[in-house]
A protein has these predicted regions:
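Active-site nucleophile and cofactor-binding loops and adjacent substrate-binding regions
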Residues: 130-139, 156-160, 284-292
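Short beta-strand-loop/turn "lid" adjacent to the catalytic site in phosphate-handling enzymes
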Residues: 53-130
């Protein structure tokens, strides 16, 4: 039995992959609920939610926060500061920290997956211009797609924030994080007015980022117009996907030779898909919101059986 953990912005998603028959069970724990629980209670709710016993687990693959403090897949006992350079960026609730610590103290074999950032070894060196490209659960999404038989692809995870990643010949070559390109529902890039607000002390940089999404930023004329917000989200997500197409073309992969996937709470909506398909000129495929957790479970399984490299990320012995 192998378990994957997706530390999302709103909730923490879990997936268990059984060896016999490949049966998958999934469940989601809200970060706010997790923060109220102790370590043993968290392990028990994982057992109940996934319909497993801890003794059955061969390996867990865990993601946490930005994952920018390391660049190889590590045993949880060898990760410093939970694998992050700082806890001050992004949505801070405390539930993910509780889950990390619960698994670290549980005795269950656990590995931690890094994010994609300037320290990543195999990404395009030009992408290292940005300190951070994608958080660790996006590696899980990419592996979920890879295990379906795709080696050249792009995916956009459109939810609280938007992150788009490209993979060429089974190697992650680049990604664009929420603070760089397309906004999400709640989080987004910091523009000129937000820079002024930060400089004037009206808002912190983290709060500015956390309220720069299409549903939180004060940009809609008059009353809230959700259709305009979704149209805006689709446009910028399509532009970000197109940017990844340019990167892949530089590797000799035309858009017609690759596949584009959508996931996330907004990405899985039919109207968002239709808009993006029209704008990019491709037929995208929608993934389950549990794709990151399932992909992480697949990583756990393959590492357990000796995999030394996952999508260009080395596995520490």
């Amino acid at each position: 039995m192998f378990v994957g953990v997706d530390h999302g912005t709103v909730g923490i998603r879990f997936a268990a992959l059984k060896e016999e028959g490949g049966r998958v069970t999934v469940f989601e724990l809200s970060r706010k609920k997790a923060v109220e629980m102790d370590g043993e209670a968290i392990v028990k709710v994982i057992e109940k939610g996934l319909e497993i016993k801890r003794e059955e687990i061969g390996l867990i693959a865990l993601t946490y926060s930005m994952g920018d403090g390391f660049f190889t897949i590590k045993n949880i006992n060898n990760v410093r500061n939970r694998g992050v350079r700082s806890e001050k960026a992004g949505s801070i609730v405390g539930g993910g920290t509780k889950v990390f610590d619960a698994l670290e103290n549980s005795g269950i074999p656990t590995i931690v997956i890094p994010g994609i950032h300037a320290g990543s070894e195999k990404i395009d060196r030009r992408m290292k211009f940005f300190s951070h490209c994608a958080s660790p659960e996006k590696v899980g999404v990419a592996y979920f797609i890879y295990k379906k038989g795709f080696e050249n692809f792009i995916f956009a995870d459109i939810s609280s924030n938007t992150v788009t990643m490209s993979v060429v010949e089974g190697i992650i070559i680049g990604a664009m994080d929420a603070c760089l390109g397309s906004p999400g529902l709640y989080q987004g890039p910091i523009d000129l007015q937000l820079l002024r607000d930060i400089e004037d002390g009206r808002v912190s940089a983290n709060d500015a980022f956390s309220t720069a999404g299409v549903l939180r930023k004060k940009w809609l004329p008059g009353v809230d117009d959700e259709d305009l917000a979704m149209d805006c989200l689709s446009l910028f997500a399509a532009m970000e996907i197109s940017a990844m197409c340019v990167l892949m073309k530089d590797y000799g992969i035309e858009t017609s030779d690759s596949k584009v996937f959508l996931t996330g709470s907004a990405g899985e909506k039919a109207d968002i898909k239709q808009r993006i398909d029209r704008l990019v000129g491709v037929e995208t495929e929608t993934l389950t919101k549990y794709s990151a957790a399932i992909g992480c479970a697949e990583i756990a399984k393959d590492v357990f059986y000796g995999a030394k490299n996952i999508l260009g990320i080395n596995v520490e012995p």
